[in-house]
Amino acid sequence: MSHPSMIRGALAWSLLGFGLNAAAQTPALFKDADLKLGEKLIAQHKCNQCHAQKWTDDGKAIYRPKGRVNTPALLQGMVERCSTQLNLSLFPEEVTAMAAVLNRDHYRFTQ
């Protein structure tokens, strides 16, 4: 029978490995993005609510696997397009932060 501290240690190493693996798979475009800022801006500008009104399936239909957005650069461009259309006046690093969060949570581009 394994000792509880050994199990916790193995779990910690496994989570650490997952975190390193996830960071290694982040596209170069989003490598230095401020994810906390992206989360804050997505909530502040009510992006999820806006998309839920415009798309079926609570706004998640836009994240279909073979949609028009199929690269990190196109994802960043779509966030920039929303910013322009809605006159949000986002700075480039804010657009990148928001796109990085969308990539992490929905698109999962690795390159």
Q: How would you describe each model-predicted region?
A:
Residues 35-40, 48-84:
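Gly/Gly-Pro-rich "capping" loops immediately C-terminal to redox-active cysteine motifs
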Residues 23-42, 84-87:
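Electrostatic cytochrome c docking/interface patches
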Residues 1-32, 109-111:
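N-terminal export/targeting leaders of redox proteins
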Residues 5, 66-67, 94:
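Solvent-exposed, flexible loop/coil residues
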Residues 32, 69-73, 89-93:
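Soluble non-cytosolic domains of exported or imported proteins
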Residues 88-111:
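C-terminal capping alpha-helices of c-type cytochrome domains
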